[in-house]
């Protein structure tokens, strides 16, 4: 089953999104992705495997955004 988490607010979105999708991790999935808006551009990051793999792909990117969406895919 897929999980989707979105955030719009004053705080930085990345950590809120990642922590939110981790709470849905038990649902089972094979990949994940995150999209945020930075500098008026959509930035997308994707990874195969667990959320920890997406965290590696994200690294230091997507740190300034205050709006985004993250998902897992079955």
Predicted regions and their residues:
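N-terminal glutamine amidotransferase
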Residues: 1-74
């Amino acid at each position: 089953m897929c999980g989707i988490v979105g955030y719009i607010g004053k705080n930085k979105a990345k950590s809120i999104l990642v922590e939110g999708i981790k709470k849905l991790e038990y649902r089972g999935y094979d990949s994940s992705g995150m999209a945020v808006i930075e500098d008026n551009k959509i930035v997308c990051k994707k990874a195969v495997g667990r959320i920890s793999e997406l965290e590696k792909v994200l690294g230091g990117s997507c740190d300034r955004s205050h709006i985004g969406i993250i998902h897992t895919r079955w």
